[in-house]
């Protein structure tokens, strides 16, 4: 594992958020007051984009649209809240990509490119109650596909790779691309992307304002755009 990956593993996949998840992305920062509902508390993590904020002031975080726990429900960027359970996200699983490959969740090609990196699944848990639904994709990743809730642990489509290798300069700050475990493009892999608008509709028409999407990663290794760099806080 590279120095950058060791730094990120220590900073991002740590503490209670990771233990609870056996997964989650971890805590790169801590807010002065809890940003989750009281029932979720320290088990929750908040996933933010550097397009909108920082670990100390994330502003917008990944949130389940209207809080509905249903397969196909979009996840989008909405204001951080300690009263709205729609933003309660916990870790479901973490491990090396090669571990997900051994369990049949990612392809041999994904393992060949990313095997030594960490991958995670993150689960919707309103008021701390797990739903078995993780942030993912309905189909194998394609350009502008929107993120939606999908059953955890069943395919590569809910697996997210912490791709420190493609943005080594931001890894020490706890910011990194999140590449879909179902990507089939390894030159410009499909990565989680936050945008200011939602003008492109998905094949399934399951859209929401500020819906998170996957788009081809650009700017690697030193100029990845802010909308494709992610971090976590508690």
Predicted regions located by residue number:
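Lectin-like carbohydrate-binding module/patch detector with strong preference for beta-trefoil
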Residues: 36-234
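Secretory targeting and sorting signals
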Residues: 1-35
């Amino acid at each position: 594992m590279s120095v950058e990956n060791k730094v990120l593993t220590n900073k991002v996949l740590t503490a209670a958020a990771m233990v609870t998840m056996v997964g989650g992305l971890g805590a790169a920062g801590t807010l002065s007051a809890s940003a989750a509902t009281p029932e979720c508390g320290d088990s929750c993590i908040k996933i933010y984009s550097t397009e909108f904020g920082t670990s100390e002031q994330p502003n917008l975080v990944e949130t389940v649209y209207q809080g509905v726990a249903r397969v196909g429900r979009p996840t989008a960027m909405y204001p951080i809240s300690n009263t709205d359970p729609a933003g309660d996200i916990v870790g479901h699983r973490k491990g090396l990509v090669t571990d997900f490959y051994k369990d049949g969740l990612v392809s041999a090609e994904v393992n060949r490119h990313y095997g030594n990196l960490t991958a995670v699944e993150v689960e919707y848990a309103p008021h701390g109650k797990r739903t078995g639904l993780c942030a993912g994709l309905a189909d194998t990743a394609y350009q502008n596909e929107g993120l939606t809730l999908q059953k955890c642990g069943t395919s590569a489509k809910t697996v997210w790779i912490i791709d420190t290798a493609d943005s080594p300069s931001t890894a020490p700050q706890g910011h990194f691309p999140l590449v879909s475990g179902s990507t089939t493009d390894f030159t410009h892999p499909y990565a989680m992307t936050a945008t200011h608008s939602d003008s492109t509709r998905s094949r399934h028409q399951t859209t929401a304002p500020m819906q998170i999407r996957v788009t081809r990663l650009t700017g690697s290794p030193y100029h990845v755009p802010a909308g494709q760099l992610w971090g976590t806080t508690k």
